C-alpha cells in the first residue's frame, strides 16, 4: 500500500499536478517510510546473523557425547576398572578398535622423527597406582613434604581412576632429544588425520588439570579430532559443546 501511494505521488508530480498534504500527514508518511527502511535493514542483518550461526552450528560433528571414543576421564570423571579388548601395536597394547589408526599414526610420525616409538598404551588401574605412588615417593626423596610431592606429581601423572591409559584409547610417544619442540609440534599437527589429538596442550592446563605434555595423545575419531584442532578445543570443552547441542 505504501509503495503504491509513493508511486502515485511521484506520477502526479511528474505530470505537473500539485498535491497539498497537511504537515502532520506528510510527517507521518515520511516517518513510515523511514521506519520501513530500518525494519527492512534490520531484517536483512538478522537473517545474515542467523545464517552465520546456523553455518557455525552445522560445523559441529553429528556425534553423541556418549560415544565410546569420547569417554571423558579426568579427576572429576573417574574411570571404573574395565578391561577393553586389546591389540598389540609395537611394544604397547591399545583398544583393538584403534589399533590400525595407531599403526598409521606411528608410521606418519616416523616420517618426521625416524626414531619415534610408542612408549605407553593401555595401563591397568593397579599399574597406574604403582606408577603414581613411585613418583610421589621420588618427589618426597627430594625433600618435599607429602602434600608438596602429591601436588607436583599430579601436574603430570593422574591419580588411579583418572588416567586415560585405563581406557586403551591413549598413547604416549617418544621424541628424540634435542628436537623435542620442533618435532612434537609437527607430529601434533598431523595427529587428527588419524583420529588423535594432543590431549594436554599448552595453555589449557586450567581446564584439563594437567600441564603441557607433548607426548600424550588421545584417540577421539578423525571427525572429532579435526574439529577439535580447528577450534582449538580440549576434550572437556568439546564434550561440553556437544552436550549443549544435545539439549
Question: Residue spans of the language-model regions?
Answer:
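Extracytoplasmic cell-surface/polysaccharide-interacting catalytic and binding patches
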Residues: 1-247
Amino acid at each position: 500500500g505504501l509503495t503504491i501511494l509513493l508511486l502515485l505521488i511521484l506520477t502526479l508530480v511528474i505530470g505537473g499536478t500539485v498535491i497539498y498534504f497537511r504537515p502532520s500527514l506528510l510527517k507521518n508518511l515520511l516517518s513510515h517510510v523511514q521506519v520501513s527502511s530500518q525494519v527492512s535493514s534490520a531484517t536483512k542483518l538478522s537473517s545474515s546473523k542467523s545464517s552465520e550461526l546456523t553455518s557455525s552450528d552445522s560445523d559441529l560433528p553429528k556425534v553423541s557425547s556418549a560415544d565410546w571414543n569420547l569417554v571423558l576421564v579426568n579427576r572429576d570423571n573417574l574411570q571404573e576398572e574395565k578391561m577393553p579388548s586389546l591389540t598389540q601395536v609395537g611394544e604397547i597394547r591399545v583398544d583393538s578398535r584403534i589399533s590400525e589408526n595407531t599403526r598409521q599414526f606411528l608410521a606418519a610420525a616416523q616420517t618426521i622423527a625416524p626414531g619415534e616409538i610408542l612408549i605407553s598404551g593401555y595401563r591397568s588401574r593397579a599399574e597406574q597406582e604403582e606408577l603414581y605412588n613411585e613418583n610421589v615417593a621420588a618427589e618426597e626423596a627430594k625433600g618435599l613434604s607429602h602434600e608438596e610431592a602429591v601436588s607436583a606429581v599430579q601436574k603430570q601423572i593422574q591419580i588411579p581412576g583418572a588416567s586415560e591409559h585405563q581406557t586403551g584409547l591413549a598413547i604416549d610417544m617418544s621424541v628424540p632429544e634435542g628436537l623435542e619442540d620442533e618435532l612434537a609440534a609437527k607430529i601434533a599437527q598431523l595427529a587428527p588425520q588419524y583420529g588423535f589429538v594432543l590431549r594436554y596442550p599448552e595453555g589449557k592446563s586450567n581446564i584439563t588439570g594437567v600441564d603441557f605434555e607433548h607426548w600424550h595423545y588421545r584417540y577421539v575419531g578423525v571427525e572429532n579430532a579435526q574439529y577439535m584442532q580447528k577450534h582449538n578445543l580440549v576434550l572437556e570443552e568439546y564434550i561440553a559443546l556437544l552436550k549443549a547441542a544435545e539439549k
